[in-house]
Amino acid sequence: MTKERFKELMQPIADGLFGKQKPYHMQQGTPPVVRPVGMIVEDLCAISDDEWAKYAFSREPLNGKFTEEQRVELTRKAMACGREYAERVVKEHGVRDPEKLAEKLGMKVDYPRMPQSTDRVLFAEFREPNKIHIYMDGVDKGEVLFAEPGVRHALTAQLDIKKLLLGHELFHWVEEKYRKEIWTRTYRLRLWEVGPVHNDSTVMVLGEIAAMAFTQALNNLHYSPYVMDAYLVYGYSPEAASALYEEMMTFAGRTPRLPEEPEPAE
């Protein structure tokens, strides 16, 4: 595969991932080694919460303002925030299932095939005040991959892609409702200060990290939903998914595996 063809494949995926990431290989224009999807999810499901911090912050506009220790600390706090609010809404409404919870919260959820604008891949989105779209093209492609070797074992039968996406988007509604008190909105980073004058900013990625923890708690998953960044993209481009896999593993301080060499012919 040429660099030009790889860039062409990657372009519509760049801004449409679950975590809205752009893989390093896209920036470099170098095609990755394509891995089996079962290998990808097996390795990514083993990454710990702290190890996801560097990947999560990698596209945060203010990323350079933080040390590695601060990224880990903020990731822990954002995840704790997401889990706290998951348990809060479950206790308040008496249901954990994301579809039933969405109904209790008065959300209008629909399941169109694809977004109206088809220039990029998009899996789900929240639109104020109370609309959530789950795009079934990506969901269906992900469900087809369940049949691939190792996928169901890694992701477990507990995974329902629609509910995972829905839970993630529900957090954005929760975050908006509690915007005056929720930690992901009240945390501020001081950008500069001159005497009594200063400029503070929210940190966008904290809401995404919390949303991942929120839907993880609702769906009772043992692995981070960030795994879906690579998994759902695989249905569109194994090359793009493999690029994300390499980047995720590297950011986590782990060595990306290569596909096994084929057995010699008899």
Feature map (PLM): residue ranges:
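A metal-dependent hydrolase signature that marks the N-terminal structural subdomain at the beginning
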Residues: 1-144, 149-151
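A structural signal for well-ordered alpha-helical scaffolds and beta->alpha junctions
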Residues: 94-95, 167, 208
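Long, positively charged binding patches that form subdomain-scale interaction surfaces
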Residues: 121, 149-165, 169
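Conserved binding/catalytic microenvironments
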Residues: 127-145, 157, 179-182, 188-189, ...
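A solvent-exposed, charged loop/short amphipathic helix patch at secondary-structure junctions
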Residues: 146-155, 189-197
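Active-site recognition of the HExxH zinc-binding catalytic motif
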Residues: 163-181
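Metalloprotease/metallohydrolase-associated module, dominated by Zn2+-dependent proteases
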Residues: 186-266
